[in-house]
Amino acid sequence: MSVSDPLGDMLTRIRNAVGRKKTKVSTPASKLRARVLDVLQAEGYIRGYTQSEFENGKAEIEIELKYYEGVPVIREITRVSKPGRRVYVSVKSIPQVVNGLGISILSTPKGVMADHEAREQNVGGELLCRIF
């Protein structure tokens, strides 16, 4: 069965794993998913991830979730731009998440990055998701 929104599928897997207090979650691999996970790791929302490839050519990413004193670091993770309704923002209209406590992840011409990086580089793009 194919997934119509691979990034949304990964975010849902993370949300469900955090709700069940799992330490790891796996998802099929893609370049976009890996770039989003790079941002999440750099911002301190996940411990890390490993990518492995199987004999049949399929690749999988195993994400190691992060907890602080038993409480999940990720409280909320939501998809903003969806396949049926893309959301694009200019650098001036990049929203702050919970007054700057959370982050937005954007796909820009300069790559996938967090909202504060996009403001520094003065670039807008597709608003992929919000994390708090």
UniProtKB/Swiss-Prot annotation:
The keyword Zinc does not apply. GO terms for biological process: translation. InterPro entries: Ribosomal_uS8 (IPR000630), Ribosomal_uS8_CS (IPR047863), Ribosomal_uS8_sf (IPR035987). The keyword Ribosomal protein applies. Pfam families: Ribosomal_S8. Keywords: Ribonucleoprotein, Ribosomal protein, RNA-binding, rRNA-binding. One of its GO terms (cellular component) is ribonucleoprotein complex. GO terms for molecular function: rRNA binding; structural constituent of ribosome. Disulfide bonds: none annotated. It comes from the Bacteria. Part of the 30S ribosomal subunit. Contacts proteins S5 and S12. Belongs to the universal ribosomal protein uS8 family. PANTHER family: 40S RIBOSOMAL PROTEIN S15A. One of the primary rRNA binding proteins, it binds directly to 16S rRNA central domain where it helps coordinate assembly of the platform of the 30S subunit. This is Small ribosomal subunit protein uS8. It comes from Brucella melitensis biotype 1 (strain ATCC 23456 / CCUG 17765 / NCTC 10094 / 16M).
